[in-house]
Swiss-Prot record:
GO terms for biological process: carbohydrate metabolic process. The modification Phosphoserine is found at residue 96. Its EC number is 5.4.2.10. Catalyzes the conversion of glucosamine-6-phosphate to glucosamine-1-phosphate. It catalyses: alpha-D-glucosamine 1-phosphate = D-glucosamine 6-phosphate. Its cofactor is Mg(2+). The lineage of its organism: Archaea, Methanobacteriati, Methanobacteriota, Methanomada group, Methanopyri. It is an enzyme of class 5 (isomerase). This is Probable phosphoglucosamine mutase. The active site is at 96 (phosphoserine intermediate). Activated by phosphorylation.
């Protein structure tokens, strides 16, 4: 966590932390970092996107960058456009799944991959420095390009089966820009599409933009009422996708990710798959069965993308529906992932519930322990020491993860709240609760010891 950048770019409440002035400084800093070039700027449907977009564009052009304004688009549309058109960088104005009073600014490199924490730290240093303006004839220019959505749609259709065989699909677009991509792609694939919340509206009147089960009741009911074959839901900027089975039931995050990993390794052969430290052990089981290898990363799509690039992974994803298909581009792509899942159902000729029934499911329990932010580093150092004294298989890529014969435990400080989170997965509910109680006690003792 930096001064301005969090786990997913610059993000916060508009008018409090995130202001047009800050957006201007961020735009100028990116322009200085790039030293010129051409940058695409996109935005989601939030009501304050226009003000922030104008400020970012002003900052970029004031540092000599040319700007292509691609309008209201999905985050993966921006990533795909930057990579396909050979631009130098991209800027997306979005707060993804956060409520409507939030917004954010996220930078993307020429491959459509999110800026790394190291790059973001450089941007922060530039933001806090004194920048000189260029000569009057060295300012950048702005052009509009409305073709970015078409570029994205066509790129997706190049990757999937286009014989939808009349499948009936319900798509919940969350009043976001996915309405311009996912329904279009699925209809081109030959599917019958029923759209929910498909009118762009930055107030998100249809539902909260985070696609979690409690926000998807309408989607589940509609799937059942229309006898649909699948339900699909995106977040506010469509870098994520989740699914509802033909039975109208929410498809488990980890089980879906495991299913996707298995299919990709079937198609591509044994290879590496990148997932974060919070992903289920069922993914390890499935990947091992296919002769592959799991690479664990910190939580966050930028870390998954970095592992894909560094380790040569054939796929990467997080259980929340953030999936990266490196053969296409390095940005998490909800519409592409949705089309990919529909293509899988077409090829298998079986419903999603039947495919998921083949994937084991293990109980997961979560707990939190209060811990002031200023104590977190020392508490986590002490937690690691205590756990190394008691356990052999320890991973510290993000927090402390303990691997056990019948499960795992992750102790990780929250990036947004004064809490330390404990996540436990085990082969039985009883064992999961037993491990939860044990590790909660360890963490509480460490907090108390540091406070003394």
């Amino acid at each position: 966590m930096g001064k301005y950048f969090g786990t997913s770019g610059i993000r916060g409440r508009v008018g409090e932390f995130l202001t047009p002035e800050l957006a201007l400084r961020a735009g100028r800093a990116l322009g200085e970092y790039l030293g010129g070039g051409t940058v695409a700027v996109g935005r989601d449907t939030r009501v304050h996107c226009d003000a922030l977009r104008a400020a970012v564009i002003s900052g970029l052009t004031a540092q000599g960058c040319d700007v292509v304004d691609i309008g209201v688009v999905c985050t993966p549309t921006l990533g795909c456009y930057v990579a396909t058109e050979g631009l130098d960088a991209g800027v997306m104005i979005t707060a993804s799944h956060n409520p409507p009073e939030y917004n954010g600014i996220k930078f993307w490199d020429s491959d459509g991959m999110a800026f790394s924490p190291e790059q973001e730290r450089e941007i922060e240093q530039i933001m806090d420095g004194d920048l000189e303006y260029p000569n009057w004839d060295e300012y950048g220019e702005v052009v509009d390009d409305e073709t970015a959505l078409n570029v994205h749609v066509e790129r997706i259709l190049d990757e999937v089966s286009v014989d939808g065989d009349g499948l009936r699909i319900v798509v919940d677009c969350a009043n976001g820009p996915s309405a311009f991509v996912t329904p279009v792609v699925l209809r081109e694939m030959g599917c019958e599409v029923i759209s929910l919340n498909a009118h762009p509206d930055g107030h998100f009147p249809g539902r909260e933009p985070e696609p979690k089960p409690e926000n998807l009741k309408d989607l589940m009911r509609t799937v059942r009422a229309t006898d649909a074959d699948l339900g699909i839901a995106h977040d506010g900027d469509a870098d994520r996708v989740v699914f509802v089975t033909e039975e109208g039931k929410f498809a488990g995050y980890d089980e879906v990710l495991a299913l996707v990993c298995r299919r990709i390794l079937e198609e591509k052969g044994p290879g590496k798959v990148a997932v974060n430290v919070d992903a289920s052990m069922v993914i390890d089981e499935v990947v091992r069965e296919m002769g592959g290898e799991v690479v664990r990363t910190k939580v966050g799509d930028v870390h998954v993308a970095a592992a894909i690039r560094e380790e040569g992974c054939v796929f990467g994803g997080e259980p929340n529906g953030t999936w990266i298909h490196p053969d296409v581009h390095m940005c998490p792509d909800g519409p592409l992932s949705a089309a990919w899942m529909v293509s899988l159902l077409i090829e298998e000729g079986r419903p999603l519930s039947e495919l998921l029934a083949e994937i084991p499911s293990y109980p997961v329990v979560r707990e939190t322990v209060e811990c002031p932010d200023e104590l977190k580093p020392e508490v986590m150092r002490l937690v690691e020491t205590r756990l190394r004294e008691a356990y052999d298989d320890i991973d510290t890529v993000d927090g402390v993860r303990v691997e056990l014969d019948d499960g795992w435990v992750l102790v990780r400080p929250s990036g947004t709240e004064p809490l330390i989170r404990i996540t436990v997965e085990a082969e039985s509910e009883e064992r999961a609760r037993e491990l939860r109680d044990e590790f909660v006690d360890i963490v509480r003792r460490c907090v108390e010891e540091v406070r003394e």
